[in-house]
């Protein structure tokens, strides 16, 4: 992920370490925490290899520290993949006016994973590394979905799924 996702993961990691250190029987460490990565399958091979190495390091370090952090990589279904849509179906290359790839290659695969978790655990909480200061569009989106006085908001589509944006108020200089 980018800098915001990295900051979010770091904060979660530090919080889990603190819980483990300060609590005799840390019941908070019983639930699995998944670091999600969307593999669009069109990334430069050098970048893809680097991402795989970073994800492996996250998983290894989590096991060393006995933290319930697990890495999961999602991929689009074949019919939603970039090349099937561009070459096979004749879609234009994604642009600002027609961003079909975000839904097919990132949102749908992640949603499938979340639905599996909800089916297994009853609910899911998504921690998302978005900030109001990223852009006016991002600020509007956050404002539209936040509920004053509530940390968790209902996911707009997925049942029993909640969203938490703990770094939404941070400025660029703070990340």
Residue positions per predicted region:
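Conserved G/P- and acidic residue-centered "switch" motifs that form tight phosphate/ATP-binding loops
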Residues: 2
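Nucleotide-activated chemistry modules centered on ATP-dependent adenylation/adenylyltransferase
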Residues: 5-175
């Amino acid at each position: 992920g980018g800098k915001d996702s990295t900051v979010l993961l770091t904060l979660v990691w530090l919080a889990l370490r603190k819980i483990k250190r300060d609590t005799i029987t840390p019941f908070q460490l019983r639930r699995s925490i998944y670091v999600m990565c969307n593999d669009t399958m069109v990334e430069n091979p050098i970048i893809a290899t680097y991402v795989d190495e970073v994800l492996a390091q996250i998983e290894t370090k989590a096991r060393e520290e006995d933290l319930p952090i697990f890495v999961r990589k999602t991929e689009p279904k074949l019919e939603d993949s970039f090349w099937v849509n561009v070459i096979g179906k004749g879609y234009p290359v994604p642009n600002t006016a027609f961003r079909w790839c975000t839904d097919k290659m990132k949102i749908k695969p992640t949603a499938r994973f979340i639905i599996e978790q909800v089916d297994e655990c009853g609910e899911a909480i998504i921690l998302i590394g978005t900030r109001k200061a990223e852009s006016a569009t991002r600020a509007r989106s956050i404002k539209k979905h936040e509920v004053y006085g509530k940390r968790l908001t209902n996911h707009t589509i997925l049942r029993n799924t909640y969203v938490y944006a703990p770094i939404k108020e941070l400025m660029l200089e703070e990340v």
